[in-house]
């Protein structure tokens, strides 16, 4: 990643930053305008490829190198980085960082964040299983299996202490056996 250059992504294609002023003047002399959409290592996905069967409400929110499975919706505040994406129909209203895989029928709620390989996840690929819900403004730094819900505003990261309970709100251990309160606390991993 550090070896990639930041480029000016323009209506005339990518331009090295050191050449930008020259190209701007040349374009002006030709009677045209040079429009710079952004300066970054990656362009927007939709400027080069639009995956079949997806909805991307704001093209600037999905970088080239992201993978979107058919049926995925990325809302205006949603964001998907390069080397990240969705396997099938998913709703993305939050941030999906580099190196993250989100499975089908999962909703990344508004303002939710999934920590990736560039934001503290290191080389661990974080995956979110099928039919999961990350509530508004929640976040994770660990992988989740199928059917998980992270409450709005809650951030779960590796090493965070988590209390386990069953459907009756009784304290349980990792095997699901009812235990005394306090014996149901584990570290997320």
Show which residues each predicted segment covers:
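A mid-sequence, solvent-exposed acidic-amphipathic segment
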Residues: 46-49, 59-63
